[in-house]
Each structure stands twice: as structure tokens, then as C-alpha cells.
Amino acid sequence: MGRSWGLALAAGERAGCVVSARGAERPGAEAEGPWSCSGVLLSRRAGLVLCHGGIVAPFLSAGAAALQPGAGPPFLGADSCRDDMRLHVQWGPGRGVGARAGRRGALCTPPCSARPAPRGQARARLLLLVCCPAFRASFARLFSGEAAEHWRFAGGGPEPQEPEADAGAGADEGPLLAALGWFALLSVEGRAEAAGGPWLSVAAAASLPKGAPLLACGSPFGAFCPDIFLNSLSRGVLSNAAGPLLLTDARCLPGTEGAGVFSADGALVALVAAPLCWRAREWVGLSLLCAADALLRAAAPALGRLGRHADARLLAALLPPDGGEPAAPLPELGAALVAAVLIECGSVWGSGVALAPHLVLTCRHVAPREAARVLVRPAIPKSSPVWGKVVFATQDTSPYDVAVLKLEEDLRGVPFPILASRFHEGEDVQVVGFGAFGQTCGPSVTSGILSAVVEGLSPATLETTAQGPPILT
């Protein structure tokens, strides 16, 4: 992508950690757990860690029902959990920018062998279990649609026991879903490091535009084999946002719940709330994030109400200033975000791109030849939908999945893209389309590369999970 990631890499390595929870051993009974997830060291010196609240849910005295919306206050103290809960935190060496790995061994030694081993586990105690109410409100708005559109999420605690017939059909209403939006603030006993460097800087999520580059630093599979997986990196972009609920196409795996997501300049933007999600049993290639600034704004006053005023002041000091300007669209994406349109054809909907004031290009399976009329909704705020009809569509047997719509009225204020004439394997591309969320929060942005270019032979296929959107270089 032609940019330097040094600051983000250093911040992620310095802040990344793994948190594990298990029950104490009792005579005649096996200990519960262990469960683990990723976390963020807000400061090694202060020993404060944020992680996903799902691993604490099994130890709640009132059960996971205490995390359900409307069940009680949006925060719980340490006394809400059983006394037999044991928490541990493991972190890496946290080399800074420009630091070099130690001398390698033989010439064939892989580069990862020069990486210092993770530190041993340190005991930690729970200070606060806090929910971000704004995140939960945005979550309810995005994911509480028609009953037929079942959503399922992975990550955030122990998997619920489900009947096989219900698997993947939205039956995930147990502790896993209840814990979405809940995060745990821990204190590491003995502090993480006596000279642990500066606190993290926290970015205002609203200041980042769609398409802004992001770097996720987490540990896939949690505490399983940290020598290999601790603080693994995944690069992506900010795909969309609904308040403090952010979506990214950075690839996150189970175990990265609670991982930090950083901007290119090394500021903490968000924590992973759910690494994987499905709609109607189809995987949606986006991860759910909770904005760090919104989470800290909820956690700081909650600590104060629990009498932990010193810790509350520490969190408040991390917050970015209020009242920042809304993010302006990225220059390379501004026109595409407006040129993308939502197309509704009966019960089917997809994306398209405006090529002229009265012409829209989309996929045949979105608007088939037999469709009498289709509704086109521009992405421009407060613009009116326009009716159109299919004037061209490839045959069902054709390898090309293309349809052209002629509109009854011209699209106003929509910039039209310049068509590319040359293509290069490996070049960066971005897709702007309405994806799985329709018009709820506008078009989404995903990033990738042009994997192959086929000329004069068979056409290439690109899977984007957003049928019909423009692909930009």
C-alpha cells in the first residue's frame, strides 16, 4: 500500500497481550476453563489491561444473563464474579521502532526464531466489567432486522451448547452474544514492567474516514501456542462505521477478541468485539470493532462510581479531545463513495455503479433480464430513489455476469468514474459497495489486490460479497 507501518507495528507489539481465565481447582471437581482472548496493555507501567468481557462471563455470580441489555447497569464491579476466578496476562517484549532482533543462528534459521519468547504469565485481578451502551445501540440497529436474516457471531467466550439443527441459524443468543460490547479492565499484579514506556495514544474513531488503513494486533486462538501466535498482525481498512461500532476487513480469527486495532500513526482506534460473523449461514468477511474512545468514556466514570478515582483519572487522560471535525472522505475514494448505488429488484438487492446520468452497471443476478422495473438508491444523503429498467443482461449461460440499467430520471450530483484501460497483477484495489448491510450505514469499503489478469482466455472471477460494486485502483 506504499505506506510506513513502523509506528503501528511498534504500538501493537508494545500493547498486545493474551488474557486467560480459569476456575481454581477444587477437591473432587475439575477446574473450569481455561478460556482466553487477546487484550491491550494500556500502560505497562500502570499495569492496566483491557480485554473482551466474554472470558469473565462464565464466572459471573448471576450468570451471563447479567450482561443482557436492560438486565442492570452498564458496568459491574469485581464482586460480581465468583471468588474462584483466576486471571493471567502474558505479553511480549515490546521492542520499539527501529529495534533489531537478536543475532540469528544458522543461515537456514527462519526469521521468526530471532523473535524473543513471550514473557511468563502474570496474575491479574478484575477491576471492572463495562459495556459500551452506544456500541450496543448501534449493534441493535444494524443486526436486528427481519427474522429470516439470522446473524451469528464467533468469539467472546465459551461457545454455547446448541442443538445441531439450530447451528448457524441465529440460535446464538447465549453468553457469547450477551457479552458483545462488554469489556474487562484488569490490573496486573506487580505491574507489567517497571519501565514500560509511554501510555498508548487513543484516536477518535469519528476522525477516521472509510477506507482508512488499520492494523490489527492480536493472538489467534488466544493462549494456544503464544510462541507462534502472540501479537500476530493483520492489515485492512475501516470498511464502515455506525457510531462506535466499526467494521474492518482486516482478517481476525477466534482468540483475537479484545485485540487492539491501530491507525497508521500508531494510535489505538478500537478493540475487536467479534472476529467472525455470518448472515443466513454465509460468512461475512468483516470483523466487528468497538471504538476505543467510546469504550474509555464509558469505563472512566464507571470506575469513579466504584470508588476507583485514581484509575478513572488515568483512563480519562487517554481520551482524545471532544468535538473533533467529522472525517472527510479519502481523496481516492470520495467519488466512488458517491457513484456506488444500491439496487433493489423485488426481494433481491445488490450494488451498482453509475456510468452516466441515466445508466447504471451491475450484475445480471442482481437485476436479471426478466425484471420489469428496479429501484436505484443513490448513496448521496437525502437523494431520492430512481426507477429504472434492465436494457441489457448477459445470458444465464454466459461467463460474464453483467447487466445495464436505464433510469427513468437522471442521477443528479453523482460523479462518474474513469474506466481503467490497463490492469496489473498485484496492484492494490478497493471495492465500494453496500455489502451485507444494505443502506443502513451507507456503502462499505474493502481492500485487496488484483490477483490475476486473464486476457483472451477465460474471464477471471472476483469474489467481494457485494454484488455489482465498482472496483477501484
Regions found by a protein language model. Name each.
Residues 11, 16, 33, 56, ...:
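Serine endopeptidase catalytic core focused on the charge-relay Asp
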Residues 37, 202-203, 247, 328, ...:
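A structural connector/turn signal
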Residues 25-53, 258, 338-357, 363, ...:
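A conserved glycine-rich beta-strand in the N-terminal activation segment of trypsin-fold
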Residues 44-47, 211, 261-269, 358, ...:
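A glycine-centered beta-loop-beta connector
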Residues 1-35, 303-347:
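Protease-domain processing segments flanking chymotrypsin-fold serine proteases, especially trypsin-like
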Residues 1-76:
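Conserved, well-structured beta-alpha core segment at the onset of a catalytic domain
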Residues 40-41, 249-272, 353, 450, ...:
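Catalytic nucleophile loop of clan PA
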Residues 262-325, 333:
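C-terminal subregion of chymotrypsin/trypsin-like serine protease catalytic domains
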